Amino acid sequence: PIPVWHDDTNSFSLNTINMPMEKTALWIPKAWTGTGEKDEAKSQLVIPAKRPDLAFLGAEGTVLNAAPQNPGPGNTPIWAGLGAGEIGDTDKFEGETYTLDLISVDGPGRMEMFIDNGDSVNRFLSSHDTAYRSVYNPRHTHLYTTFTQPGRYVANYKMTARSADGTAIYSSPITPLVWQ
């Protein structure tokens, strides 16, 4: 999701790169590193041993469908994190802050968005853990997006901010983003 602020209507919308988010479907194809020595599926994440910080994803050895945090050469299979957006001056918002909320996810399993630092994890958004449903002042961020089951997921997002004088609440419509 990429937040966009519209000064003319005092409202938000959500995009993916240069398209309205509701007109976008993100596809995770079967993709491989193609190194020849050790081909790895870039469209999967296997939960490694001795990483208790990844326990929220499942047990060690669990295989998840994934859009990688850093897809690498050829941009395979897909990278989709958070965009910096077109917000402009944030002084129009109370505390100069605005929020991206994950309202709901409809799909056959769980969806998680996080940063893997190698020895620790920063969780961002989760379909099932309500403690991870909001990101304050979202910025350009590279995230893993994982899915416990293959299939179609519809993630519904909303942007919200309060006016600097506290008299108005600005928000986007609830906007779907499809993953498959």
State each model region's role:
Residues P1-R139, Y170-P173, Q180:
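Phosphate/adenylate-binding glycine loop and adjacent helical scaffold
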Residues T141, Q149-Y153:
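Short tyrosine-centred short linear motifs in exposed loops/low-complexity segments
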Residues A155, L177-Q180:
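Long, charge-rich, low-complexity alpha-helical segments
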Residues Y157-M159:
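Hydrophobic/tyrosine-rich beta-strand signature of extracellular beta-sandwich/beta-rich modules
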Residues R162-T167:
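Short, solvent-exposed loop/turn segments at the edges of extracellular beta-sandwich modules
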